[in-house]
Amino acid sequence: MTARPVGKLYTPEMLHLATQLAEFPPRPELPLHGEARSATCGSKLALDLEIANDEISASGLLVQACAVGQASAALFAQWIDRRPVSEVTVAGEAVERWLAGDGRLPECIDLAPIAAARDYPGRHGAILLPWRAFSDALCNAHG
């Protein structure tokens, strides 16, 4: 098996996104909480949420992940503000289909900075962390 060039995956744009997580600190005072862990790499993410009028009104993250997972989390956090819950759910499903090779790069959220990670199945779990934590938070709200 030939090693893939690391430079293609870890671009300056991706690494810059990873540093932007500081703009979305944990918010334990928010009413909804979800967690996700990648089975392939052990990365994990905790998401704090508030939903008002069926829209995301506030969020915070605690991310312990590789640069791919951090960049995915930053893209997610930048995108979800004031989005309807249903739109976030549908986008997560589109991301999963795209990673599985069953769909195009989702247009609803700009994942271009991490698109190269699709070729690295070991990173798919890290990319999906925020979406899975979101789903977990919704389940916890109804559980």
Where are the model-predicted features located?
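C-terminal binding/interaction regions
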Residues: M1-E23, R83-G143
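Short, thiol/selenol-centered motifs that function as redox-active sites or metal-ligating centers
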Residues: Q64-Q70
